[in-house]
Amino acid sequence: ICNLLINSKFLPQLHIVLLDGIGFGGFNVVDLPKLAETLQLPCIAVMRRQPNLEAVVDAMSRLPNLEKRKELLQRAGTIYEYPPFVFQVCGEDPEIIAKVLEKLTDCGKVPEALRLAHLITAAVMKGESGMTSV
C-alpha cells in the first residue's frame, strides 16, 4: 500500500486511508501503525461487525507465520464500536474517526468509498458487481 502511494501524485490529496478490514487476500495482515506512520495519515480498518478473534486466530494457525500475524493484529490496536461502525484506527482519535465515517457513509455500515471499491473490484474480477447483475 505504501509503495503505491508514497511516490504517487495522489498522496498529497489524501486525508485518510480506509481499509476494508485489517487483512488482504485472507490473512495477509496490514501493519496499521506502520502504515499510518509511513504515510503520516490516519489509517482506518473498517469492519462490518465485531470479529470473533478466537476464530480468526484459529484460522490463522493453519498458515505460516502465526506469531507474526498475531503480533500485527495486536499492533492494530483496539477495535472500536461506534454504531453502526466497527473499526480500528491509528493516527487519529476514534471519536473523530466515527464522525468522519458518518460523513463518508450514505447508508449502512460501509463508507461509500469502500463500497464503490468493492463493486469495481467485483466487476473487474467477475465481469459483474453482484448476484443481481445482468
What are these regions (language model features)?
Residues 1-24:
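A glycine-rich, hydrophobic loop/mini-helix early in the fold
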Residues 8-12, 30, 37:
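Domain-level cores of phosphate- or acyl-group-handling catalytic modules
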